[in-house]
């Protein structure tokens, strides 16, 4: 379940995420920019109900440098993420490849340096846009536990998103 503060209000987002957690959601996704007290409340409630916390970052304009992406992933971890989700906008293949490089760092243990293996969150990273479309498939091969698809072509929430039908082929 997800409910972005940017698309609603903090109160509404909290109510929606709380309802999802109490009704048995397996995952809740909260943006990295969420106020600390909001994130802490949702994290505590999620732990109480056995729900996994996704702390996510989205860049709708481009793709940060690899060092910036590493810093973002590490910040998500410090905020208590069970899963770190990083989604960038690829303007070209180099942007998409830079986002995928996070999986190499994760595999080498370098993404979350100093964290014991059991303390390292899972990673979901891919790129939006036509130049990044392939990363939505590649991320699954590189270790992401899931990717995002739309119910149909008219339901896409981001550029480059596959439909459920396309993914099932």
Where are the model-predicted features located?
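Glycine/small-residue-rich loop that forms an oxyanion/phosphate-binding "nest" at active or ligand-binding sites
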Residues: 1-37
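Catalytic alpha/beta core domains of metabolic enzymes, predominantly
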Residues: 33-169
